[in-house]
């Protein structure tokens, strides 16, 4: 097929995306090739680049997120090759107007009043911007009705990208001016509410147009947060020689009739959603480690038989974290003791975490691709087809892909939060957490240390609000604009709610990370205390049970191994606050062992020199004299950084995450003896997460993963 010119661009196959893919299904499927982890790595790499080059067709959500979050650290460049196509459509509109051709929004009124006609094309565009400036910003400090700075920057970038494709009838100079605003970190003030994203985001986008045309009510925020009027904004940006634009026919419509605000904010949301969903997978693996979970739940055959790629990858990532984990090795030994007295399998929050997270990740990946198609789409009306010399009246401004993808993403985000809450609830509950103290209390006196009890209440609150936000927005459509816009996408509203949901998920993630680090440190403390208890019992047993009164070997010397097995079987935190208490399990079980040996001692019990019963009192008396001191010494040694046993986490693939939370952010092991509260530590992590600082340690945990599950052996 001969090449055709499409508004200044050359395409080998006319309007077909691919010769054998006229409906674009193959291209859409191919976008999901490769692992989610690889996609996240690509996003992060793009996010960190210092230049975004716009040509209309290759913009990514990570580039949008970078422009939104990094202000003037990232420069926007327009492809010079786009200039001809943009000019061609702009010229066509002017020629069409001069010929007297009747075109929507050029010679007609708008929407339900498009039956009106005018030859004053410039005045019509001016009126369009005036009547669309219908937003409310409010005053005072209690609330704001201004769209966040980051969302506005995202919208500006996406709108430029759309208009660069040359189907909208706007001058290239206007796009250059918006680019200058971005590069000089000058951000127009847009209203937070007032759009239904159906004839595009008309109301908020009209405020960008208002700044470009110098409307007296237009405002912007400068690079240092200062308030600017239009004149100051133009001067600071060095835009258009400081002259406001007099809009030509169609240019006002080109600026406002698009989905850029909804899709721009959706891009920001999905960049975060992809990272947080990956974090949820890694945190689930850490949860398995500190809970002494059974790693069998990650076995590849289980997930291969289910077929879902998200589940298979989630399991493979967890398997990678757990493979060779020092916690897993220790847990396997623990599970071998008294196996018939323990649950055969872990609870759902751990065992089915790949099955739970996998579909959510698939939803988020699909939404990501849907939004990437949207931000590279031409989404205004009418579209100027220079090659066929006509204006096409359609409805690409309908932002349904945004509303639907954001509703679906929010449901996935809520599901991730629900799993996180279920895992957190198990972690702090001493009935379920395999020996960790209730509320993860780390202090010496559990009666004066309630650990993460407040955090669990906060997590319940976060989770409840998150579940509420999972409700769809798109089923609340109202017929608008004299029943012309009778179905509308509510794309920006759904995007806003998704950003809210992500903020709550970050609150949950930061709280959960602090709790996981507390659990890691408690396991470290547990090991050191157990060793101290075993050593003390062994020494006391040797002194009191090994020999008789005359130095002869005593039958009770055979008790020592069984006494040490008691220590291995008993949860340390069930007794360690008062290790010699007769009401706690340690002393009860130790006495039980000695009594059982005494009962087996037979005739020797009648002889005072060989009686085990008569040794029990001496054993317990000496143990009470030395054990509390030894336990305290072990705790102090750990607090002083001189533990007898090193922290297992340093041998694990999850260590970079722990190191980041503990060392780089400087969070601490929490106890009731200290002033520091859980909320203060969670705040540090939340702030770091909001700045994107969690990304590097997260990816470092997965550095060695080859993108495939372990082979089935």
UniProtKB/Swiss-Prot annotation:
This is a key enzyme of plant metabolism catalyzing the first reaction in the biosynthesis from L-phenylalanine of a wide variety of natural products based on the phenylpropane skeleton. This is Phenylalanine ammonia-lyase. Its EC number is 4.3.1.24. (E)-cinnamate binds at residues 257, 345, 351, 381, 453, 481, 484. One of its GO terms (molecular function) is phenylalanine ammonia-lyase activity. CDD domains: PAL-HAL. It is an enzyme of class 4 (lyase). Disulfide bonds: none annotated. It catalyses: L-phenylalanine = (E)-cinnamate + NH4(+). GO terms for cellular component: cytoplasm. It comes from Digitalis lanata (Grecian foxglove). Homotetramer. The active site is at 104 (proton donor/acceptor). Contains an active site 4-methylidene-imidazol-5-one (MIO), which is formed autocatalytically by cyclization and dehydration of residues Ala-Ser-Gly. The modification 2,3-didehydroalanine (Ser) is found at residue 199. Keywords: Cytoplasm, Lyase, Phenylalanine catabolism, Phenylpropanoid metabolism. Pathway: Phenylpropanoid metabolism; trans-cinnamate biosynthesis; trans-cinnamate from L-phenylalanine: step 1/1. One of its GO terms (biological process) is L-phenylalanine catabolic process. Belongs to the PAL/histidase family. There is a cross-link at residues 198-200 (5-imidazolinone (Ala-Gly)). It is found in: Cytoplasm.
